[in-house]
A protein has these predicted regions:
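All-alpha prenyltransferase/terpene-synthase fold signal
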Residues: 1-285
């Protein structure tokens, strides 16, 4: 039994109910919108974030309709942000499959992302919980600011760990934090419990993103990420930052210049950074 199946066991029925509710958001009478929504739905991931939310709710109490609508809202927000991010990053792939903007075009992708974002607002309204609504609204602001920070860093090419941590805190960890906290809130957990859930979610999200960035330097059909893709797009992740800041080798100095000039290729990236992956793995522990 794989690790995700083990994690799902305590919430199997609840997760099935979530999936039904989530999938119900991806239908529309308009032909084009229905087609694109179906495409997005079929490319869906493992729903790790809703699992975290449901597990937190069950840990502190019961999974209710408030929990389910919260989980759907957060997963929809995550989905819409990925569609918009692919447009901004000009990415042709998402999870090893053609992105929405690649399969259709940027205009369609932006509008479908907006439609899903509006569906977030509809679903979170069904929680009738002001704290959850406010938390989700603030999360949307944080995700957008994180994407802008990453764009700014791509332009400025500042090779600094603190900026990297701030980007992944806003773009990834904030969503894990929200899932953990809102899961606890939906179960009427105490303020102290919600604070602990937030901290757990934040740390889990940071670890998740650092490990995901490591995968960028290895071929993997399972995760659908080409080797060195982030660096080729100008995104300076932790393996790159550490390598560039902790060596005097001429080869690495040349690599740094190519990164800033945007002339790096994936073979050069892989060869130069393999030795530094162990350092990054240690930072997740």
């Amino acid at each position: 039994m794989d690790y995700l199946s083990i994690i799902r066991q305590p919430i199997e029925e609840d997760l099935n109910n979530f999936t039904k509710l989530f999938n119900s958001c991806f239908s529309h009478k308009d032909a084009l919108l229905s087609e694109v929504l179906s495409y997005v739905q079929k490319r869906g991931g493992k729903h790790m974030r809703p699992m975290l939310l449901l597990l937190m709710a069950k840990n502190y109490g019961q999974i209710t309709d408030v929990t389910q609508y919260s989980a759907v809202s957060l997963e929809l927000l995550h989905t819409s942000s990925l569609i918009h991010d692919d447009v901004v990053d000009e990415s042709d792939e998402r999870r090893g499959q053609p992105s929405v903007n690649s399969s259709y075009n940027n205009k369609v992708a932006v509008l479908v992302g907006d439609y899903i974002l509006s569906t977030v607002l509809l679903n979170v309204s069904f929680t009738y919980n002001q704290r959850i609504v406010e938390y989700l609204a603030e999360l949307g602001r944080v995700l957008a600011s994180g994407e802008l920070l990453q764009l700014s860093n791509i332009k400025n090419q500042e090779i600094r760990e603190d900026i990297y941590y701030e980007v992944i805190q806003k773009k990834t960890a904030a969503l894990f934090e929200a899932c953990a906290a809102i899961g606890a809130l939906s179960a009427n957990a105490s303020d102290d419990a919600v604070a602990k859930a937030k901290e757990f979610g934040m740390n889990l999200g940071m670890m998740f993103q650092i490990r995901d960035d490591i995968f960028d330097y290895f071929d993997s059909k399972e995760i659908g990420k080409p080797t060195g893709n982030d660096m080729a797009e100008g995104k300076l992740t932790l393996p790159v930052i550490y390598a560039l800041n902790n060596t005097d080798f001429e080869a690495m100095q040349t690599l740094a210049k190519k990164v800033k000039a945007g002339t790096i290729n994936t073979d050069e990236i892989r060869m130069a950074l393999t030795a530094y992956v162990d350092y990054v793995i240690q930072r997740t522990k």
